[in-house]
């Protein structure tokens, strides 16, 4: 599932290409045709991301003028020069030159302002957004006995954080993944949050997740650069049984609530 920085990049791309423009909205697949017709031929006002949720605002004179998208595990949204649709395209937004095609989303629906407010109200603060309030995340974390590794993946705690950012921020802050939220020190939470802000906003800018500091980079250490579909240089994510880039001990992995968790038992001992 794409992490939050991907959704923010998509919002930026839609704004840059279509913002303020009259667009054609269609459903080549046909499944979204009735809803697409309601906003077809209207101006795309803006696109915004909250965590892993994308909302696209049209100036159509209907209550349900907001397009709500959640890509889920397999969904994809991409912009390309206008051409005949390829594959199963649920939704297409086009200005006649460029098309944004949506395939396989978990959510694709038109909603009202009130609907959007309900969705956003259920989400925790998004580290990428300027209006994020980390205190809301702290209040949920320090009242819970669940492991911090579980809590960070809870979208009601921190919106947009996924498996990669979860593993990497805990490593970078030396936090034991099994540390219960109600024993995590406030200083540790503050460090986690600030690091998420830096890492995730950097992900928006560069389009990939890079978490390794210069002294541990391939250039500095002479090691082979990472080759992975997710791009980016990371410390522990998908590095199970390989030596830790800092201490040399084996990176560990385990299933936690159905997702693979990666950590270094030597480097990550703090609470």
Question: Which sequence ranges carry the predicted segments?
Answer:
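Structured catalytic/nucleic-acid-binding cores of DNA maintenance enzymes
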Residues: 1-271
């Amino acid at each position: 599932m794409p992490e939050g920085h991907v959704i923010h990049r998509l919002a930026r791309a839609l704004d840059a290409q279509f913002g303020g423009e009259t667009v054609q909205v269609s459903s080549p697949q046909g499944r979204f045709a009735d809803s697409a017709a309601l906003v077809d031929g209207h101006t795309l006002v803006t696109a915004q991301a909250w965590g892993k949720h994308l909302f696209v605002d049209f100036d159509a004179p209907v209550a349900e003028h907001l397009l709500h998208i959640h890509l889920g595990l397999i969904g994809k949204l991409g912009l390309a020069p206008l051409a005949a649709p390829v594959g199963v395209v649920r939704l297409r937004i086009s200005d006649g030159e460029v098309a944004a095609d949506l395939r396989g989303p978990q959510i694709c629906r038109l909603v009202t302002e009130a609907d959007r407010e309900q969705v956003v109200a259920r989400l925790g603060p998004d580290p990428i957004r300027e209006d994020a309030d980390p205190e809301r995340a702290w209040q949920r974390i320090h009242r819970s006995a669940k492991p911090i590794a579980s809590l960070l993946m809870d979208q009601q705690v921190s919106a947009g954080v996924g498996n990669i950012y979860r593993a990497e921020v805990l490593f970078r802050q030396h936090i034991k993944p099994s540390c219960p939220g109600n024993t995590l020190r406030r200083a540790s939470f503050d460090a986690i949050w600030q690091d998420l802000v830096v890492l995730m906003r950097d992900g928006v800018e560069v389009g990939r997740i890079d978490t390794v500091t210069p002294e541990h980079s391939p250039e500095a250490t002479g090691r082979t650069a990472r080759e992975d579909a997710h791009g980016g240089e990371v410390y522990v994510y998908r590095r199970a049984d390989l030596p830790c880039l800092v201490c040399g001990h084996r990176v560990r992995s385990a299933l936690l609530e159905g997702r693979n968790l990666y950590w270094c038992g030597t480097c990550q001992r703090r609470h």
